[in-house]
Amino acid sequence: VLYIQGTPGVGKTTLANEVALKIKTQGELRNNKSDIYSASSRNPFDDYYGQDIVILDDLRPDSLSASDWLKVFDPLNSANMSARYKNKLVVPRVIVVANYQSPLKFFSEIKGEDVNQFVRRVNSMISIESKQFPHFDFDNIYNLSEVVKLSTPRNLRISQDEFLTLNFDFKTIIDKNDDKEKFIKQALDEYILPRAFPPEINSPSANGLSINKTT
């Protein structure tokens, strides 16, 4: 799960589509049939038919139930959605969420579930910030973070009298890069693609071939 966060108009949707297309291309180079599904905010999975890359662009927290959000984000199991979506089986390889809210703020608004259950299922987050003085193509700053488990839980204030206890948080791994193409390449090559296409998926043994190893 990749979460892209930034203010309206900063280019979240464009970046989500660019990243999804590059993942699709890499899948096809690995002989994996790949396709992209962009979900609508009203009925996100009505037109979903097994695409392996899913873009959830500007969905609201209540676009899915808490249980359906968790099913979609589950990295280990195929997810049968609720009857609202006719029990569709959702089996994406990659989910790209684009939203103006931070993940912590977004998931805190989903009722009936601990926010940590959502945050720990996010692998990476890209945050986009507009420069105060933009210059041609280098008008944004891009950061990549990954989710880490905290050794000591921390409290996050989300309103005047409400706190969240966080067991997971985001750690920056690529900081303040204003070269979009360079940033995308590094993020994909070093962090996103290795998760999307684990080595065993494309190994000869995974394709039914045996390998004789000598030690």
Go through the PLM ranges and name each one.
Residues V1:
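Pre-Walker A adenine-sensing motif
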Residues I4:
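Hydrophobic anchor at the beta1->P-loop junction of P-loop NTPases
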Residues P8:
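The conserved Walker
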Residues K12:
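Conserved lysine of the Walker
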Residues L15:
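Hydrophobic positions on the alpha1 helix immediately C-terminal to the Walker A/P-loop
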Residues K22-S65:
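AAA+/P-loop NTPase substrate/partner-engagement loops
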